[in-house]
């Protein structure tokens, strides 16, 4: 994802949030690319990038910070959210939360919603340079949190599951109707309150 969060400001700069969902490049290819090495907090995982882009000179764009938005607030552990795996008997296996596939912003309300592999996340972006995680949701029927969409008023958010991936979609007649769907939440006092699921009943 790469979402324009604010701007251009009086200095002609815009702010973009970026997160990739591919594997981390080898350190031999790019020195600052460090994968999932236990105990190494320099990893490119478990964070998003805040990018500042001068509209008049985009070649001078730069990453201004890479906040660890999935960290445990008490221990500081980078992987503080869903660790991956299923949720118990007859539940979906959900990917680990270490990247965001989609971050959608609602600047006038100072909110962003992230579909972040293993969780749906609500962010306070009133300071665009310093996004803060304010709520997290899980779903035992989701495999990979794929997209987040606000309604026009910014009072609801729909999270969509990518069950099986684009090339292995599992919406066949024999697949479980309880797995993979749209999950609809109301935003109440900056918290996500689950309301319902929606899934197309017709198999592909």
Model features per residue range: what roles?
Residues 1-204:
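Feature marking well-ordered beta-strand scaffolds used for ligand recognition
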